[in-house]
Every structure is written in C-alpha cells, then in structure tokens.
Curated annotation (Swiss-Prot):
GO terms for molecular function: DNA-binding transcription factor activity; transcription cis-regulatory region binding. Pfam families: MraZ. It comes from Gluconobacter oxydans (strain 621H). Transmembrane segments: none annotated. NCBIfam families: PRK00326.2-4. GO terms for cellular component: cytoplasm; nucleoid. It comes from the Bacteria. This is Transcriptional regulator MraZ. The gene is mraZ. InterPro entries: MraZ (IPR003444), MraZ_C (IPR035644), MraZ_dom (IPR020603), MraZ_N (IPR035642), MraZ_sf (IPR038619), SpoVT-AbrB_dom (IPR007159), SpoVT-AbrB_sf (IPR037914). Belongs to the MraZ family. Coiled coil: none annotated.
Amino acid sequence: MSMFLGTHQNRFDAKGRVSIPASFRAALKSQAQPGDPLVILRPSHLHPCIEGWTVGAFASLATPLDEYDPFSEDHEDLAASLYADAYPLDSDKEGRIILPENLRTHAALTDEVSFMGLGRTFQIWNPEAAAERRQAARSRARTLATSRRPASAPAAGNTAGAAE
C-alpha cells in the first residue's frame, strides 16, 4: 500500500490551482479504481486544515454509519458532517487541483500551502499553522510514547541497572 509521507510546500498559481506533490499523486493513483476521483477533500473536524482521502479510505469512514437507523437524527448529523463538505476532485495533467473556496477559507490558505503526509491520508495546511501543528504533534507524541512504554523496558539511553 502506498503511503502519504513527508511535508511538501507548494504555491497557488495565478488561476488558483495548486499541485499535489508527485509522491502524493502516485499514492493516490495507485489506490484509485477506474472511474474514481483522484482524491476526496474535506475540512478537518479537529484542525484548521483540509483532509485528503483516497476513495477507499474515505469509504471506510462510512462504516460506522451502518450502526445507526438511516432515518434517525444521529445518522443524518453524522452523514451531513461526513459528506456535505466532501469534494471529489481530479487533477489536470500537471497534477494541479482547484480547492473549493470554503475549504481554502477553513484552512486559512493564501499563497502557499503545506501538504502533510499522515500515512493513509494527508492534510493541506497554511504553512505557518502546519509548522505549529507538527511541533505540537511531536511534543505530544513524545509524551504518548513515554507514557505507554512497558514498565520493564528501560527508557532509551537509560542503562541504570543494566548488566555490565
């Protein structure tokens, strides 16, 4: 399975298009089925960014909806939050897309954007906000990693009590 890796910065052109990084395009194309759009974009519920999904990964988000009565308010709210602001997009031959204005506004995008790989998905950020998010994520990841370490495993670099 192709993954979305790294952080890449691109600029909008005069027509408002931005190029999806080549490695991200390759990952999207490798997972697309005939007739599928290249990517599905939607606003993040957690951050001021845009989420990028393959059709398959996006479809997996709908699985929990099957647990709800399709005529219930809960189902309708979840479906609206998932689908109403989702945009299936294809790129031109150069790999450029035009981001819908409401997504650009949600992510506070102006001239430049950062594409941030998250493994099976990616995000599109304002570059300054992306840098802050990456720093916060690294800090939190350190905390999570140390809090989940088994008691019997010494911390990296900690050789206290190790046999000599």
